[in-house]
Amino acid sequence: SLQKYREDIVITVDDDVIYAESMISDLVKGYDRFPYAISARRTRMILRRENGLESYKRWDGNLEEYAKVPRMDLCAIGVGGVCYPPGARSESWFEKEDMMSIAGNQDDLWLKYNEILDHIPVLYVLPTQKDSPIRIGNVGKNSLFCSNINGGNDHCASTLLERLRTAQPSQYQKWFYSLMNWNEYAAQKRAYYSNIIRTDFDKEKDM
């Protein structure tokens, strides 16, 4: 659909998930606010280490404070539903042989790689309905989800990062060094939640 309908808004979903009724309206509202960005109801914050990316397990998905503006360090997660704006999808998105050999089971990462190439940011859209998508069927120990979390995503992300460094060195430098490391990210999180606690305390004090 992303290739066939390049000049249209495209919303993608997982076919084994039951979604909240507000899913489409949430994504369309995100698009209306920032029509140049990808809108996603689930995202992860990509973090870096000194010589590479932080483990996928540490890419935080609790990102309420980052839901205001589109960012290049967010990775859209397809299971939550994703809205792609018209156009701005180059041919590299659809290189099927490369996609299958590098990211056959990690389409979220393949798409993020191409979003970096095409300078497309991601907007985290806070779901109107807080209930998470309900996956149909059981997730076993040998499932694709478990395989990706336990190293599959890390290998794919490292391969794509090296591909970016080789193909677009200046773009790689700009994007990679714009990422936060774990300590920087943790400090921002602490400051955010400390401010919430102070605000709630002040409200109670004034009552």
Residue ranges of predicted features:
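Active-site nucleotide-sugar/metal-binding loop of Leloir-type enzymes
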Residues: S1-I9
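Structural element of the ATP-grasp superfamily
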Residues: S1, Y84, R89, L111-E115, ...
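Conserved catalytic core of nucleotide-sugar-dependent glycosyltransferases
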Residues: L2, I18-E97
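C-terminal catalytic/acceptor-binding lobe
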Residues: K96-D206
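Short, high-confidence coil segments that cap the C-terminus of an alpha-helix
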Residues: E7, F34-A37, I120
